[in-house]
Amino acid sequence: GVRGGVGTTTITAALAWSLQMLGENVLVVDACPDNLLRLSFNVDFTHRQGWARAMLDGQDWRDAGLRYTSQLDLLPFGQLSIEEQENPQHWQTRLSDICSGLQQLKASGRYQWILIDLPRDASQITHQLLSLCDHSLAIVNVDANCHIRLHQQALPDGAHILINDFRIGSQVQDDIYQLWLQSQRRLLP
């Protein structure tokens, strides 16, 4: 999303669920240090394991994968300590090996879809993961905050804009939406 709170994690979970309902094999990866995607898949709140947690602890990140259905696998981020949360510069560079792992999974053909819930930050690992993506969606709410951000911050190359939480009866949202129809060429219908 272009900012936190626009529903990116929820949309990622819903898309993963919908694709597996259509018979597609899906891996959904949480790349957000908040580690919230797992909650959309009924993973216990106290579950601390995840791919990043495993890598930081010197373990194999593949062991952190969870089978949700026969066609949907989840790779949670894992829980960071308070110290790690406050000092991301100390650990982010240690996570880059996940990129080659995801490339291998993509090449294996095991999954028709690998969905990555990316944080809205400019970290090195976020840029590395984004470079692996064939397509990207920038999730927005129709509000002044997202409107300003669409004009002030660059979207990833080729990203499409997907509106979430659009309220037809809101005059303010309709006004902003009308502006976007004229100014945002990558707006999904």
Predicted region positions:
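P-loop/Walker-type NTP enzyme "switch/lid" segment
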Residues: 1, 28-106, 112
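Walker A/P-loop phosphate-binding motif and the immediately C-terminal alpha-helix
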Residues: 1-34
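Short histidine/acidic/glycine/proline-rich micro-motifs that form metal-
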Residues: 3-6, 81, 165-168
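Short strand->helix junction
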Residues: 4-6, 44, 143
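A conditional alpha-helix N-cap/helix-loop micro-motif detector
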Residues: 9, 94-95, 119
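Conserved catalytic-core segment of NTP-binding enzymes
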Residues: 103-188
